[in-house]
Amino acid sequence: MEDKRSLSMARCEERNSRGQDHGLERVPFPPQLQSETYLHPADPSPAWDDPGSTGSPNLRLLTEEIAFQPLAEEASFRRPHPDGDVPPQGEDNLLSLPFPQKLWRLVSSNQFSSIWWDDSGACRVINQKLFEKEILKRDVAHKVFATTSIKSFFRQLNLYGFRKRRQCTFRTFTRIFSAKRLVSILNKLEFYCHPYFQRDSPHLLVRMKRRVGVKSAPRHQEEDKPEAAGSCLAPADTEQQDHTSPNENDQVTPQHREPAGPNTQIRSGSAPPATPVMVPDSAVASDNSPVTQPAGEWSEGSQAHVTPVAAVPGPAALPFLYVPGSPTQMNSYGPVVALPTASRSTLAMDTTGLPAPGMLPFCHLWVPVTLVAAGAAQPAASMVMFPHLPALHHHCPHSHRTSQYMPASDGPQAYPDYADQST
């Protein structure tokens, strides 16, 4: 019996020795920092003392990785600070403060280890990776900034006038328990400065203003702008362009032109034909005028200069124009003098429905006309003549108007001297 027991014990020892050589034993859980086993190890393994031993290299690497995770998240990146890194709630909540005041309190507080003042107190230092995890990635209840992106945070700094002074990159080396192998951690620091953002001058924060970014207009709006400007031309602009640079399709009758003369050109375009208009000019007399005046009423130097206009691209027809006058002064053979509607103007009317071209309809005391502003070369007219007005004593069988509705006077109301010349 004793031989059997000794034989079984020898086999168990042989199995244990084989398992240790091949690394098949169970991996122990990393000891707690305050446990008695960690503070006073009873039987330290030779693998901890000799990092170059070939007893269990896989076990040593696995232990280092497991122990590095909590240290890298909490202790390795952070500097010592008081307990409780949660900003106070209520009136002192950092989320409700403006950006400069909020940032100044973050830098001046000891609750955060990812941002601090430099030695001079004129710049603030940001540990980029730790700042993104410690402040930007906080939960909603403890949120400090509305954004969660480090790029958006740096964009806010630029809008408030912060300037990057320099950038520093260094490595932090840590040890895992009692192992002699060092682990390096890359840290990236950003230095930002502002003349109004000082450690000892918080009253200057009110001078910091956020700039508004200027956005360029969309390209399609810029392309549509010339088209809209070309299609929305005013009638006056169109007429001015016709005088200065006529179109190729326009047929122009050549006439003698002077720099300051009143002569104009006859145009034929898309507008309907209009009745020729006569505007008297006391300074210029033309022998080619188609309409002459009786010698008893007008002098030789006051003959009217006729300016025919075939196309009038002007505004719509104005209200009816009333021609005042006395029945004794109005006849069907001579012109009738009336007051002009506006200075520097040309009167034109539609010829549709007229008895003959150049004649006004009979038995009509109101005449619809169109007022078109003339160019600067045309002199101002003092009187307007309407040729071939019918006498009011003619009775129209289809009209109920008689001459008794006209006020009896010796001449036109606006020209009292004309009555003396006609008597």
UniProtKB/Swiss-Prot annotation:
Q: Which cysteines are joined by disulfide bonds?
A: none
Record-listed cross-link Glycyl lysine isopeptide (Lys-Gly) (interchain with G-Cter in SUMO1), residues: 215
Q: Which GO terms describe its molecular function?
A: DNA-binding transcription factor activity, RNA polymerase II-specific; sequence-specific DNA binding
Disordered as annotated region, ranges: 1-56, 215-303, 397-423
The answer on whether this UniProt entry bears the keyword DNA-binding reads: yes
Name the residue ranges with Basic and acidic residues bias.
1-25
Could you list this entry's UniProt keywords, alphabetically sorted. Cytoplasm, DNA-binding, Isopeptide bond, Nucleus, Transcription, Transcription regulation, Ubl conjugation
Q: From start to end residue, where is composition biased (Polar residues)?
A: 243-254
Question: Is Transcription given among the entry's keywords?
Answer: yes
Which Gene3D superfamilies does the annotation name?
Winged helix-like DNA-binding domain superfamily/Winged helix DNA-binding domain (1.10.10.10)
In which tissues does this protein get expressed? Testis-specific.
From the record, give the transmembrane residue ranges. Answer: none
A GO CC annotation recorded here is:
cytoplasm
Q: Which residues bind DNA?
A: 98-282
Q: Which SUPFAM superfamilies match?
A: Winged helix' DNA-binding domain
Q: Where in the cell is it found?
A: Nucleus; Cytoplasm
* Listed SMART domains: HSF
Family the entry assigns: Belongs to the HSF family.
Q: What is this protein called?
A: Heat shock transcription factor, X-linked
Instruction: Name its species.
Output: Homo sapiens (Human)
Which gene holds the coding sequence for this protein?
A: HSFX1
